[in-house]
Amino acid sequence: MPITQNYGTGRRKSSKARIFLRKGSGNITVNGRPLDEFFGRETARMIVRQPLELTKNVANFDILITATGGGTTGQAGAIRLGIARALVEYDASLKPELRKAGFMTRDAREVERKKVGLHKARRATQFSKR
């Protein structure tokens, strides 16, 4: 008997996450490690759990996550989007609720490129009147 699972991808900044949602007891594994071990910060763990708490599915699924690139905040945001997409694939009636909460929208903000002649993207040399 094949394992039925739902799949979702999420991206944020330079992070990418692949999410596999299976019926289970609420275990969340990121890159082979438990969620609490993978993310040191409590805020990152809260971000990951938001779609599940909103739809009251915290203890209904086992989630297997592969996250690459970026930092902790970017990966947490990518995972949140991926989980939301996987939940919609599982049950399309959850989509309006997740969209209203903003979990279905990809955060398009990226790092602005450094410009030639400037120190950073916008930081210029100090202006001297004389």
From Swiss-Prot:
The gene is rpsI. The keyword Plastid does not apply. PROSITE patterns: RIBOSOMAL_S9. One of its GO terms (cellular component) is cytosolic small ribosomal subunit. Pfam families: Ribosomal_S9. HAMAP family: Ribosomal_uS9_B. One of its GO terms (biological process) is translation. GO terms for molecular function: RNA binding; structural constituent of ribosome. Keywords: Ribonucleoprotein, Ribosomal protein. Belongs to the universal ribosomal protein uS9 family. This is Small ribosomal subunit protein uS9. InterPro entries: Ribosomal_Su5_D2-typ_SF, Ribosomal_uS9, Ribosomal_uS9_bac/plastid, Ribosomal_uS9_CS, Ribsml_uS5_D2-typ_fold_subgr.
